[in-house]
Regions:
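A mature extracytoplasmic/lumenal domain signature
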Residues: 51, 66-69, 96, 106-110, ...
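C-terminal motif of bacterial Sec signal peptides marking the signal peptidase cleavage site
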Residues: 21-24
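A short local loop/turn or secondary-structure capping micro-motif enriched for an aromatic residue
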Residues: 72, 112-114, 140-145
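Core segments of small alpha/beta cavity-forming domains
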Residues: 29-75
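Bacterial N-terminal signal peptides that target proteins for export
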Residues: 2-13
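Surface-exposed, charged secondary-structure patches
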Residues: 78-126
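Low-complexity, intrinsically disordered terminal/linker segments enriched in charged
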Residues: 134-160
């Protein structure tokens, strides 16, 4: 009888310890999409800034946000925003590919007047200069296909 009580007590203690340990470890992890780089930017902020700059045709900002933007010879480095449009209602699906790459699927629900509904795929990568949008061009179709049929790591919208 004493052995049975001792076994139950040890089993209960072990379960409680495992539960406590898993809760402690789970809370210490930061979602990659919310992680800040040295400049204090998150991948999500970079993606949203890029989407806004693209809508406003703000080449100057786009070149700051993309990898190797300073080497670009197509976009005008001095061209700021050509309008002040913004997406008021959107939904974003976030797919963490690995610790250095996050893919975003941006969907505008109600685009600004005279603008078509926008569905964009944007790849944000970690660089030695912080998080950057990988390229002004959309990711390759095979890269999109790799994540599009999986469950998003996270979802958020303009209402969050």
């Amino acid at each position: 009888m004493v052995k049975t009580k001792l076994k139950k007590l040890m089993l209960s203690s072990l379960c409680a310890g495992a539960l406590f340990l898993s809760a402690a470890c789970g809370n210490s992890e930061t979602n990659v999409g919310e992680e800040k780089d040295k400049q204090g930017h998150t991948p999500r902020e970079m993606m949203l800034d890029f989407v806004k700059a693209d809508l406003q045709r703000d080449h100057k900002t786009i070149l700051k946000l993309v990898v190797d933007g300073e080497k670009d010879t197509i976009l005008d480095k001095n061209q700021g925003p050509k309008n002040n449009l913004s997406y008021k209602d959107y939904k974003v699906k976030e797919y963490v590919v690995d610790k250095d790459t996050i893919m975003y699927n941006f969907i505008s629900k109600k685009p600004p007047k005279n603008i078509d509904k926008e569905i964009k795929w944007i790849r944000v990568v970690r660089t030695d200069k912080g998080f950057k949008v990988r390229s002004y061009a959309a990711p390759y179709r095979n890269e999109i296909d790799e994540v599009a049929n999986t469950k998003p790591t996270n979802e958020f919208s303009s209402k969050d």
